[in-house]
A protein has these predicted regions:
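Peri-membrane helix termini and adjoining interfacial loops of integral membrane proteins
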Residues: 63-68, 106-109, 169-181, 298-299, ...
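Helix-turn-helix repeat elements of alpha-solenoid scaffolds
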Residues: 540-552, 585-597, 629-638
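Alpha-helical transmembrane segments of multi-pass inner-membrane proteins
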Residues: 1-23, 43-56, 88, 92-102, ...
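Alpha-helical solenoid repeat scaffolds, predominantly canonical TPR units
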Residues: 222-223, 227-230, 534, 550, ...
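Transmembrane signal-anchor hairpin modules in multi-pass inner-membrane enzymes, especially those
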Residues: 1-118, 132, 136-156, 208-226, ...
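TM-adjacent membrane-interface loops and short helices in multi-pass inner/ER membrane proteins
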Residues: 190, 310-376, 383, 390-397
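Amphipathic alpha-helical repeat scaffolds of TPR domains
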Residues: 523-541, 556-583, 600, 604-627, ...
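Juxtamembrane membrane-water interface segments that cap and precede transmembrane helices
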Residues: 22-36, 108-117, 175-187, 306, ...
């Protein structure tokens, strides 16, 4: 039973890592492009957590007959000089910072579930789900076999996504309707996320030059073609940050290869990379509507450092990011929110931030003046995003874990080099997973990560822990003297508990997590997915009456979905104005009041949402134009609130 649960957890984790990059609203089967990714992440991570806890319960039940079944755990002895275990401590602090950030949030419900489905990856629900994926890989993928499965997953999903992106570049996309885009998005919904995923996939695919296959030449040809597809994909994404990060990941790949392999092995991967690059160049010269967008974007990289502008408007490229970063750092000195809050909360803001998913609401308070209504919902730097939303505790915890895991790669490569084993299975795994992690860390400095690429990123962080433990254990067997010298004496930080106490705690945790996770998934994810499916089916109904019934049903199913609510409000407002122009004033008032009431209901959940406030001001303005001057005060109050 224990082994079956282990296998279930491993394959459910793999399912999460496949669906995060590849799932979306195929053939418009739901109304929101990336919703299937989010739902599957919540489902798989919840299932992993439930299985894991019940496995602990079963193990404790089975150990009742054992003579030594008491829990004894010495923290410092366990951590020792092991960098990845210190990284696990840092991740634990990071999770604590997220929980504290949510508790202190001015809008805890928004911080837990998120305000907008387009901002995935930063609310607590998404963050905890991603952390479970991280933990699953870190603790359950501790064998060469499971780590190879992870490497295969990254390469295969990256190749499929790249092939789809290339098809979009040349005008074909019968699946998602995104053919002929200037910069392709593949199955990700955003060019940056697609490019960010290729940053991880490219070095992992390069590593397969050293994988032993039964038919080496055929396999090498397939791997080279896969690499060519991935390089072409990131090229057609036109994402400068990911292209630079991919270069860093490739450089780190060859640095590690030079440390572990022979000249012949180095030349083998260099040749594969060269052939793949030539294929990419050929693909890039093929005629398409938008030409060679990759070349144009790469040439413009140098201009990003010399571009000067006196405008404070948010624009693309580095100048826009410098603008955002300047305002973000200003936010980290003020910690202002657009609502009044208790003094105690204000004092804790530097430690635990403004609250998860709160960046978008506070940015206008520190941002430079804009000539347009440009909302910034991300710092375009992952660490700065964490700093603002999770404070210095969350920021330092994540940075510490990332630094420690990067250090673990260096330590591991040095030990492997001394062992003189060359690029064996362990070396292959280090090359497949470590440069991918390092390259992604670079990409996060200018990217806008979402769960489509964050899921694999978290898996790679977990893999850094797993592979270090596996390789370190193997090398310790080969170097027993050094292993003995690394033994840490017992410390005073020791946790002891009887098996009965551990069993009772595990049962309580398993029951609570099962009930809470199931309840949240059914009441939140499935309900919203059902509403999205209803809208997708009825969106193009043949009659106005059928479409109206569809929208009414969707609104009743998911009144908290701002994108649905605001779109429906605009429909009511437009129809009301048409009816008023035709002289049907009563019908016009009825329709406008229905739309206004929807926004007022949504305002109770999220009083800071920008579109909602704009919509309510438009409703008040329309009422005044129609002669209802009693809305003048409301309009004035809302206008002042928005200006402030």
């Amino acid at each position: 039973m224990d082994n079956r649960i282990d296998q279930a957890i491993i394959w459910i984790t793999v399912l999460a890592l496949v669906t995060a990059p590849l799932f979306f609203s195929f053939f418009d089967f739901v109304a929101v492009f990336n919703e299937p990714k989010v739902v599957m992440l919540h489902f798989t991570s919840g299932l992993v957590a439930i299985l894991w806890l019940w496995q602990i319960v079963l193990n404790r039940i089975n150990s009742r007959s054992a003579t030594e079944n008491q829990l004894n755990w010495d923290l410092l002895s366990w951590v020792g000089r092991n960098p990845v275990r210190w990284a696990l401590i840092a991740v634990g602090i990071w999770v604590f910072a997220q929980l504290a950030s949510n508790l202190l949030s001015p809008l805890p419900i928004i911080s837990f579930f998120g305000g907008d489905e387009a901002r995935s990856g930063y609310n607590l629900y998404d963050s905890l789900s991603l952390t479970i994926i991280f933990a699953s890989v870190a603790f359950r993928f501790r064998s060469f076999k499971t780590l190879q499965i992870l490497a295969y997953t990254l390469v295969i999903t990256g190749t499929i996504a790249a092939a789809y992106g290339i098809a979009q570049h040349f005008g074909w996309d019968a699946i998602g309707g995104n053919g002929g885009r200037t910069r392709v998005i593949s199955s990700f919904g955003n060019t940056l996320n697609f490019g960010g995923y290729m940053v991880m996939a490219i070095p992992a695919t390069l590593a397969f030059a050293y994988k032993k296959f039964n038919r080496d030449r055929t396999a090498l040809v397939i791997v080279t073609l896969a690499l060519a597809l991935q390089i072409s994909g990131i090229w057609f994404s036109g994402s400068r940050g990911p292209i630079v990060a991919a270069a860093v990941s490739i450089i780190s790949f060859f640095v590690i290869t030079a440390s572990l392999g022979s000249k012949k092995e180095i030349l083998k991967s260099l040749a594969m990379a060269a052939v793949a690059t030539v294929i990419t160049a050929i693909v890039g010269t093929l005629p398409s509507e938008h030409g060679d967008v990759g070349l144009q974007r790469v040439i413009s990289i140098g201009n990003q450092f010399s571009a000067e502008t006196s405008s404070t408007d948010i624009v693309g490229g580095l100048s826009g990011r410098f603008n955002i970063w300047e305002s973000t750092l200003k936010m980290a000195t003020q910690w202002d929110l657009p609502i009044e809050e208790p003094t105690a909360n204000k004092l804790l803001r530097p430690l635990f931030g403004l609250g998860q998913d709160m960046y978008v609401y506070s940015f206008p308070l520190a941002g430079n003046p804009q000539t347009t209504l440009a909302l910034v919902d991300h710092a375009h730097n992952y660490e700065l995003q964490l700093l603002i939303e999770q404070g210095f505790v969350g920021f330092l915890a994540f940075v510490s874990s990332a630094v420690l895991l990067s250090l673990s790669v260096l330590v591991m490569v040095q030990r492997m080099r001394r062992s003189n084993n060359g690029i064996d299975t362990a070396g292959f795994l280090v090359l497949a997973l470590s440069p991918a992690m390092l390259g992604k860390m670079v990409e996060l400095q200018t990217g806008v990560a979402r769960i489509s690429d964050l899921a694999m990123n978290m898996a790679l962080l977990g893999a850094a822990i797993a592979i270090y433990e596996v390789v370190n254990s193997r090398l310790s067997v080969e170097e027993p003297e050094q292993a003995a010298s690394n033994t840490i004496k017992p410390s005073s930080i020791n946790i002891s508990a009887s098996n009965q106490m551990v069993l009772g705690s595990a049962v309580l945790a398993a029951v609570l997590v099962t009930a809470i996770a199931t309840s949240i998934f059914v009441s939140w994810d499935l309900r919203r997915l059902s509403a999205s499916r209803t809208l997708a089916v009825g969106y193009e109904a043949p009659t106005v009456e059928e479409r109206a019934r569809t929208w009414a049903k969707v609104q009743a199913q998911a009144p908290e979905r701002e994108s649905f609510t605001f779109t429906l409000f605009e429909q009511y407002l437009s129809t009301a104005e048409q009816q008023h122009a035709l002289g049907n004033t009563k019908e016009a008032l009825r329709l406008l009041n229905i739309g206004r009431d929807m926004l007022l209901e949504y305002e109770q959940r999220d009083p800071l949402e920008h579109d909602t406030q704009i919509g309510l001001m438009r409703a008040a303005t329309t009422m005044m134009v129609w002669g209802h001057l009693e809305f003048a005060q409301e309009l004035g109050d809302r206008a002042i609130k928005q200006a402030e």
